[in-house]
Amino acid sequence: MPRYAQLVMGPAGSGKSTYCSTMVQHCETLNRSVQVVNLDPAAEHFDYPVLADIRELIEVDDVMEDRSLRFGPNGGLVYCMEYFANNFDWLESCLGHTEDDYILFDCPGQIELYTHLPVMKYLVEQLQQWEFRVCGVFLVDSQFMVESFKFLSGVLAALSAMVSLEIPQCNIMTKMDLLSKKAKKEIEKFLDPDMYSMIEDTPSRFKSTKFKKLTEALCGLVDDYSMVRFLPFDRSDEECMNIVLQHIDFAIQYGEDLEFKEPRENEEDKSENFDEYFQDRTDES
């Protein structure tokens, strides 16, 4: 039986921990068992129980206080993640070997972990060796994405993670419940965007022809290949959360290997009568 994992990624403040907490509660209402692993060594607080916490292995504060290392916040976090990559046996012992696991990995927000460093790629490969089907879940703050150029910046961040990790990925706009009605209408065009028309709407923002050509080339890459699309995530809307979960489940083929109960005898009789009915209709025609 395969195991399933979501790598919950995104910039700092995009709502990764809130997403994990909300998704755990939502899955509980669906009678689905979901666990969370915290992979952020700089995390201070989260309101959900964790299966494993990287801070039990190493913490950013301890690294920064080590005078022999002399790391700042970013350097300390990179050091922690590289140390983690050299100690995957700790994670394996925390996860155990239970079949049909469904685990959310709450990841750090530093984008260089996905674009410049191989740490997260190593994690994906290790999880796949442990028979996990892995889906990336990249979050961006919807309040940040209401302008065309900011939206393009978020698209490129999501695309860089997608290209680097080489796994199925769902891109999500979070905090939709915090938007005003006017902002919600404005942001609808960014969920399934026409990149070219977005650039045409802001011609006065281009300060040089080179910048315009670069922007048009990036928009063409995203638009022509339909590489990045976003799903809205409103934690107050059960249907919205269902849609997000269904997209992720489809990406990792969740449920295809679940064992189903055998039909009872009366159900078998009904199915036989159902087949006979259609056979009779075929004979008549």
UniProtKB/Swiss-Prot annotation:
Keywords: GTP-binding, Hydrolase, Nucleotide-binding
Cystine residue pairs: none
Keyword set includes Hydrolase: yes
Region (Disordered): 261-285
Biased composition (Acidic residues): 265-277
Molecular function as annotated in GO: GTP binding; GTPase activity
One Pfam family cited in the UniProt record for this chain: ATP_bind_1
Keyword Cytoplasm listed: no
Site, as annotated: Stabilizes the phosphate intermediate: 74
Listed PANTHER family: GPN-LOOP GTPASE 3, XPA-BINDING PROTEIN 1-RELATED
Family that this chain belongs to: Belongs to the GPN-loop GTPase family.
Known role: Small GTPase required for proper localization of RNA polymerase II (RNAPII). May act at an RNAP assembly step prior to nuclear import.
Known partners and oligomeric status: Heterodimer with gpn1. Binds to RNA polymerase II (RNAPII).
Designated name of the protein: GPN-loop GTPase 3
Gene name of this polypeptide: gpn3
